[in-house]
Amino acid sequence: MKLSEFVKAEYGKSISECTNEELYYALLTLTKKMASGKQHGNSKKKLYYISAEFLIGKLLSNNLINLGIYDEIKEELAQNGKDICEIEEFENEPSLGNGGLGRLAACFIDSIATLGLNGDGVGLNYHFGLFRQIFENNMQTTVPDPWLTEKSWLTKTDVTYDIKFKGMTVKSRMYDIDVIGYNNTSNKLHLFDVESVDESIVEDGINFNKEDIKKNLTLFLYPDDSDEAGRILRIYQQYFMVSSAAQLILDECVAKGCNLHDLSDYVVIQINDTHPTMVIPELIRLLVERGLEMDEAIEVVTKSCAYTNHTILAEALEKWPIYYLKKAVPQLMPIIEVLDDKVRRKYHNQEVYIIDGEERVHMAHIDIHYSSSVNGVASLHTEILKNNELHHFYEIYPEKFNNKTNGITFRRWLLHCNPQLTELITSLIGDGFKKDATQLEKLLDYKNDEKVLKQLLEIKSAKKMELKKALMEKQNVTINENSIFDIQIKRLHEYKRQQLNALYVIHKYLEIKAGKKPSTPITVIFGAKAAPAYIIAQDIIHLILCLQQLINNDPEVSPYLNVVMVENYNVTWAEKLIPACDISEQISLASKEASGTGNMKFMLNGALTLGTEDGANVEIHELVGDDNIYIFGDSSDTVVERYAQGSYHAAKYYNENAAIKEAVDFITGEELKAIGDKDRLERLFNELVFKDWFMTFPDFDEYVKIREQAYADYENREEWVQKMLVNIAKAGYFSSDRTIEEYNRDIWKLED
């Protein structure tokens, strides 16, 4: 059905007579109708991809692209004086995720559907997400981030389950979002919500009564866990998600004729990080309840589950006190004790026990012992897991460990966010790359084609203008579109080292003040949210915002250097920032970033990576070669060794390196104190000088040197654009379609 006919039937008027809001809701309804007619994966075995987050982004354009009607709709709207981008402004971005974990899950379910595989996502229907970030007085403040409207991509289902906690039962209801594959199957994202949820209990900012479980359970993603009530709420939340999922899985299996003894022939559960771990003991509990012996239930569940590890950070490998679990979900503890007892009888090594000497349950240990597969998400990360962090487990289960390097959906991160580049690529090599991203390699034939290289630069300039316009409209910030766009966008964490980037900005500011001006102006752009309880991360944001105010208002410096921090960084912002970027900052401390996927998105859009040998940067480096990437910093081996020996002392670097001392002293100098919060700046200064846990200082000199090298190379436009082309051509490996094909081949074994 043409849009004009649908609009006529819906509103009784033509497209040109409709408001943009009416057209948005018409397109929403039409798209959902078309998705419902798509075939769902129907193999005997089904995947359930369980994740605490799905950072899916706005869905309208993405769904129209995947249905194959985007160009047709865009053209029909344009003929009636309507702009699809303006219509999309009426869509709220779903507040269902925060960082790379959630974005990866979103890319994966897109690829699962595109490949025609039988697999659904399972998560929670958060009402307010993490939070909406607002900058006030150069500080991050937090308010709820509502996204649910009466009409949305969510469809309420009749599926409900009783979820039993200690002393109470709550009802969960399933809501579905269609996951439309590219010219293929349509699957589901199942999101569970508590029926008794009450948005009105949120008070000032994002504060609420953490103990009112019946009302608060699905309000926020990752509720503040700086106190006991917050930590126990996380257990309630996680159990609510996995108990709903487990009941759904068993119901769907029985409906297919499965006798539960053969569960693993019908089901594979991918556990995305440790948040869904309790699905293992919960499934065992339910199977025993339904008549299986304990040992058989354990065996069946182990065969059915697979675990993805996303981090080596100890803080993120969840360990819950037994006391918390008994307070919230006492019915799970007998199962967990049985699982631990089995491990203790077999392996006499307390490093691999599930319950430790401090009466804590290690969630990752449950996942490793009672899953059939354990995977890392980049080759370096997987090697670190095998040789260091999870070495004791690797010695026990070498056959379980495997690598699945992360990927991204090219539908969103190229076709949707950079249609100009998509059009150019299609004109050169055809559209086969849309289904087989490795075909991008054909672009290498054009490495010396002046016309093509000129078009690439023109597209980059156009995307810079679009970003300039967006920043002006959204934040009233002006940037120079002819400057180098140097961008770091990711969750705020010390290991990702936004503080290193900020120290470089100070260094550059002082250089310009001393008369050393760059040949081409530089715009340094940040986007990041800091967890409300993560004080130092908030202090780093404060420093960046103070630098933004200081530098952008300095007439001596601002013609050459600008700093911008985008407010409330999310997928929608990423879609504007990534195509406009020249230099992609991927500067985590080597060994700490499992993979990263922002690095892949930037590469695909022709940005050059400036980074450490960490995560997927290693594989990008291998693909593009030394000449097309900017690598600096200590190796992961050096870093791991330094931690092991306890040999790093930040104060020594501070006292012995004049450039470091000058930049760090500036944090508490008069200029910043005049506009910033003295306590925050001093706390950050002390953290860097006396702790610097993520080793900013050892990499500082090399970082300055390589960044200056990148800026110098940018001056040679012909060579720079050739580097851009090589990066785009080599990005095909990082398609999430490739990643999902590997998961299916090695772990899931679904028929397509």
Outline where the language-model segments fall.
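A conserved ligand/cofactor-binding region detector
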Residues: 1-752
